[in-house]
Amino acid sequence: MKMNNKKVKPSDSAGIVFKIFLLFLSSVLFWLSNPNIFFEDGLGCLAFLNYLPILFLIKKSRFIEAVFFGAVYGGLSYGLYGYWLNAFHPLGLIIVCIGYFVICALLFSVLKWADIITSKNGWLLQFIIICGYEYLKTLGFFGMNYGVTAYTQWKNLYLIQICSLGGVFALNYIVIFPSVFLFSLISKKKEKYRLLNNVDNGKKSSISAYVKKEKALSDTSLKLTFICGGLWLAIFAASYIYGLSVMGKNNSDRYVTVAAIQNNESPWKNGIEEYSRNVNKLIQLTEEAQSLSSEIDFVVWPETAVAPSIIYNYDYGTDMRRFLLISQLLNFIDENNAVFVIGNSHEEELKNTGRTRYNSALVFESGKNVHPPEPGIYSKIKLVPFTESFPWKHTFPYFYQKLLNGDIHMWEKGDVYKVFDYRGLKFSTPICFEDTFSTVCRRMVLNGSRCFINLSNDSWSKSNACQKQHLAMAVFRSVENGVPSVRSTASGVTCVINPNGKVIKAAPEFCEAYIIGRVPVIDDGQQTLYTRIGDIAGIVAAGLSALILIIQTIVVIITKYENRFYR
């Protein structure tokens, strides 16, 4: 039996080390460009280079290596980015890391395939693929917007105004392009030097050398690279000019005053004593806010701020302590002049299925729908995968039971994008991470909403980075649709956002607090281009990349077959 004593060349070892360096660099760039434990607002400027090391890594790797590196990149990047999921449950972080282990392995394989089947300008196809990937990863049951590159620019108010025209995925084109431009510029210059050096050192006739030199110059031409770079520069400048023009505009001459309450309570504490203490705290904070301003039109409490179902315990409840707590709350609301928007674990009694639970927002107005409680109700439609919803509980009962053992709350899904109309303000109430989805909020605006009142509870994360990541996405919902947002959260970030995405008031995180802010009343006729056309920028990128990949693959197969046939 022969032993393989083949030694690893120093150049091979250096190549492996460099690939690992590129892998870690790309993960760190992704992590630091978003809100993180070191920079709570994120270093958004780094996002313009996020994909540069990835493209070089793919270029230098064989296909199977690219798949492996993609898997490691996905798990590592989202492990760093979403470390706070471990505070909820280690299984949550594991699921996300495994999910992106698979997703990024597929992404890298497609990017490598694009590199293989294109001879000159594969970087341009890779650019479209990346933009398409960032849209596709937000779709479906597992889809989420966390980690979309353009969200890193949430503090860059002038630049993000372009989202009112094409949404966050249009901005993605602008932020991602510098990575592929620099990759093309550097790699083509290196390749040009290598090819010309080979021609000069080769023992060829002058005619053969001339032909090879011309081919080398053609294959490494930077003409298209510079044309695309110039076009990007023009679009970037135009986006800033557009941002400057719209930032100074006054959106409305009518306002309502809103008090958003932050109770700083943990979602893990249960029991009637805890519920009573929390409701009393919310009432106290509300009274403090109202003592500072007699003009408050709306009071907003966070997601599931009132844990016992208000309507169920009033109409059907058998627990006297819960009934008394609900009665105390309703009496307080009925004696108050403000409209109350309250997060509640709403329950309904159904004949066939028994009691059904929803994560809901209830809207009360004194003298109209408080006694008996008949509030306007919106129930969360986009539920968090695995922690609020698991559609395959009958297919995978063991795994479903494991999830339930993790002390999570499974909710029924709502079915109506409700728009409330109180005191001249038409608003919708996206709950928790619903305001991270452009499709959800756009649907609400199309239904007539002119303000988002978001109820959230991210206190379980014990992380400022988590709450800033959430806020960053909420900012874009206002810009895309040209409407203000009010966020009432358990621990942060409770704030008021104007239609241009500027956070005009915010409460400190992880403390009991409230903010009082004026919210513009937007006219019904005002609707942004994005609201009308939706995420067409993402759809085009996904569709175009798939089409080009298919066509180019067919061309390569036919060419290879013809070369064999005529050989």
Language-model regions, residue ranges each:
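Membrane-embedded alpha-helical bundles of multi-pass enzymes
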Residues: 2-246, 463, 474, 489, ...
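Short, solvent-exposed loop/turn segments at secondary-structure junctions
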Residues: 87, 308-309, 349-350, 460-463
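Short beta-strand scaffold segments in enzyme catalytic cores
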Residues: 359-363, 418, 492-497, 515-517
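Short, conserved active-site loops that position catalytic residues or coordinate cofactors/metal ions
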Residues: 38-53, 262-263, 295-315, 449, ...
